[in-house]
């Protein structure tokens, strides 16, 4: 696909914090739009991977608006929890994505697996997939991760 300059870009999220973070990383000459401008609800994320869920969002929002859309899916994988919460990370925070609630659940689940987990370094990683789509066509999709531990 030939490279073309992007003048307008839709950020495929209803999370205002995420929108602000992504916007701060992009060139100032790109006209940024949010899903809230179009009163769009998020699609059902029924993919099995971060990449699949990212693509579901970018294609959905692009088709709804006719704009090129950048969307992400990200989460925490914890080895002791069989890579959970994984693609369900946001759901661990409850209906409103409460970070403190999600962390409490992580600690609770770790304690169920190993009561002494706090004395150990539990391998974990943050995974993020980003995709750009135009209508129903994927332009690009990448994924990366940052390895670390919970202690």
Description of each model-found segment:
Residues 2-10, 16-151:
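Anionic-ligand binding patches
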């Amino acid at each position: 696909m030939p490279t073309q300059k992007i003048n307008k870009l839709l950020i495929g999220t209803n999370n205002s914090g995420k929108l602000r973070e992504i916007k701060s990383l992009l060139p100032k000459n790109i006209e940024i739009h949010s899903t809230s401008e179009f009163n769009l609800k998020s699609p059902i994320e029924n993919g099995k991977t971060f990449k699949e869920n990212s693509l579901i969002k970018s294609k959905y929002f692009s088709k709804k608006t006719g704009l090129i859309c950048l969307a992400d899916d990200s989460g925490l994988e914890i080895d002791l929890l069989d890579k959970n919460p994984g693609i369900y990370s946001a759901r661990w925070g409850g209906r409103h994505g409460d970070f403190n609630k999600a962390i409490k659940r992580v600690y609770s689940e770790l304690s169920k697996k190993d009561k002494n987990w706090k004395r150990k370094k539990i391998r974990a990683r943050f995974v993020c997939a980003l995709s750009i789509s135009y209508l129903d066509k994927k332009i690009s999709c990448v994924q990366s991760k940052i390895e670390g531990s919970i202690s």
